[in-house]
């Protein structure tokens, strides 16, 4: 059972809001799959982990990332048991060059599980 499940469109420059408010110290897992097209050419395809090998891009471009408090974090095909470094809402997005999202299409399917909430001893 996931805390959030949905699609992350490749053409959403501001990403997809999950509505999940995370706190520093929470532990989450994220799993993603699917294919998106991020350009006009027929070789510009990417999975959450990045572009197909015949069209290499800089390491952070054409990948799935999380944004929390305006800081980006690599997600790719998924992360397991990761500690959230900052407080904020979890936004998921396809990382592309700003201003170039208009020719993107497709979406990733993503599931997010909040495994534990940070609760320090008092």
Curated annotation (Swiss-Prot):
Positions that bind an alpha-D-galactoside: 44, 57, 96, 103
GO-annotated molecular function: carbohydrate binding; metal ion binding
Pfam families for this protein: PA-IL
Keywords: Calcium, Lectin, Metal-binding
Classification via InterPro entries: Galactose-bd-like_sf, PA-IL
Coiled coil residues, start to end: none
Entry superkingdom: Bacteria
Positions bound to Ca(2+): 38, 96, 100, 103-104
Use in biotechnology or industry: Can be used as a fluorescent probe for the specific detection and visualization of the alpha-Gal epitope present on porcine tissues. This epitope is mainly responsible for hyperacute rejection of porcine organ transplants in humans during xenotransplantation.
Family per similarity comment: Belongs to the LecA/PllA lectin family.
Function: Lectin that specifically binds alpha-galactoside-terminating glycoconjugates. Shows high apparent binding to the alpha-Gal epitope (Gal-alpha-1,3-Gal-beta-1,4-GlcNAc terminating glycans) as well as to Gal-alpha-1,4-GlcNAc and Gal-alpha-1,3-GalNAc. Gal-alpha-1,3-GalNAc may be one natural ligand bound by PllA both in the nematode symbiont and in infected insects.
Subunit structure of this chain's protein: Homotetramer.
Stated name of the protein: Lectin A
Organism this protein belongs to: Photorhabdus laumondii subsp. laumondii (strain DSM 15139 / CIP 105565 / TT01) (Photorhabdus luminescens subsp. laumondii)
